[in-house]
């Protein structure tokens, strides 16, 4: 799923007079990709928190409450600053420190806490992208993924409903 950054909170969560699932539920068992993360409204970003934690979302309306599954992988991308050149190896950033901070603050700490992996990707020069050396084939990568899933399946064979690490819970002490 790849919703536009102008999406409404209702379209993201689901709703309506007769509740329908939103993008969060439609991404169940898949990927929800948010490009230009800070461009989404604060409300839209904040409604992601609970489903990321609980893997379900409840849509409450006057007539009823509906619970939808919401076990998805959130993949998001963003620039390091409004102009996009902060930390760029060859281009100068034109943003003030205050502008950079304001831009980064559009994403709350609690939401960032739910994003398990954060990577800074530096731009590649065209020459490196155009390099004609063959990369790893999709078939080879596919086999590696299948093997990893088989290992996980064997690892959790005795635990019903668990097929990946994100479904594991620690017992309360």
Q: What function would you assign to each model-found segment?
A:
Residues 1-105:
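Conserved ASCE/P-loop NTPase catalytic core
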Residues 32, 64, 70-168:
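Conserved short S/T/G-enriched processing/targeting/catalytic segments and their helical context
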Residues 169-173:
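Conserved small/polar residues in nucleotide/adenosyl-binding loops
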